[in-house]
């Protein structure tokens, strides 16, 4: 096509070259617009995450029971979606919470939540020790159902932490949600830090939790 242009008039050549120029500029413009839109969407999701995580979530236990939910900022970020689907009796979550603090929080809240399913996450904010994980599971062993979520945090301690969590989940008969495996290959679940969840990740996380909750028949039979 370009080789044939030399046999056309100067006016035709100019017009055709200008047309090619417009196509190139339009393509560049569309690419730039898409990039800007992607950045804007990322900024919007990041702002939503920041708003959700500004305040810790600590609620008073409800008289009618419900789920006992505790953990760090990932739990904090999924609380509204979980609350929209299930009855939460108590939630106690905070940004940056580590295992030592989690153990103390569990001890303080335990008296009010006897008979409730407990949902907790572990391993995002520090390298766990065997003593810490053992103490946490020992403290909650009498709950009728324990649901523990492991970590997908992009840190060097992730696999080591998850091995400890799996060991004690098996020992105490807990339901283990392998968030590391579930989220593998799904960057769209995470915000820019690779830890906190955007809406798609929140839904997947809560889906995994609700799949492990006791059914009505199990509750009736005391399982």
Model-derived features: positions:
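Catalytic phosphate/metal-binding cores of nucleic-acid and nucleotide-processing enzymes, i.e., regions
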Residues: 2, 55-60, 103-106, 111-120, ...
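Catalytic-core regions built around general acid/base machinery
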Residues: 134-143
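Catalytic His-Asp segment of secreted/periplasmic serine-dependent ester chemistry enzymes
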Residues: 158-223
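Conserved beta-strand termini and adjacent loop/short-helix elements that scaffold enzyme active sites
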Residues: 92-94, 149, 177-182
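Conserved SGNH/GDSL esterase-like catalytic core that processes O-acyl groups on lipids
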Residues: 60-135, 153-163
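A short helix->loop->beta-strand "cap" motif at the edges of active sites that frequently abuts
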Residues: 142-145, 174
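N-terminal secretory targeting modules
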Residues: 1-68, 80, 111-114, 210-223
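A generic structural signal for well-ordered alpha-helical segments
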Residues: 82-83, 140, 168-169
């Amino acid at each position: 096509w370009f080789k044939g242009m030399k046999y056309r008039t100067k006016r035709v050549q100019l017009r055709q070259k200008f047309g090619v120029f417009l196509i190139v500029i339009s393509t560049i413009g569309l690419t730039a617009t898409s990039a800007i839109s992607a950045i804007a969407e990322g900024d919007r999701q990041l702002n939503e995450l920041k708003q959700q995580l500004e305040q810790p979530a600590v609620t008073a236990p409800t008289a009618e029971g419900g789920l006992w939910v505790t953990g760090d900022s990932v739990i904090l970020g999924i609380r509204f979606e979980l609350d929209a689907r299930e009855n939460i009796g108590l939630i106690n979550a905070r940004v940056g919470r580590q295992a030592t603090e989690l153990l103390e929080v569990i001890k303080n809240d335990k008296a009010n939540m006897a008979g409730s399913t407990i949902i907790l996450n572990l391993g995002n904010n520090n390298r766990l020790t065997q003593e810490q994980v053992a103490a946490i599971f020992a403290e909650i062993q009498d709950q009728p159902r324990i649901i523990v979520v492991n970590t997908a945090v992009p840190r060097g301690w992730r696999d080591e932490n998850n091995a400890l969590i799996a060991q004690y989940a098996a020992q105490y008969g807990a339901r283990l949600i392998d968030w590391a495996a579930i989220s593998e290959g799904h960057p769209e679940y995470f915000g820019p830090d690779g830890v906190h969840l955007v809406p798609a990740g929140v839904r997947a996380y809560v889906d995994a939790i609700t799949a492990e909750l006791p059914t009505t028949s199990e509750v009736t039979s005391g399982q």
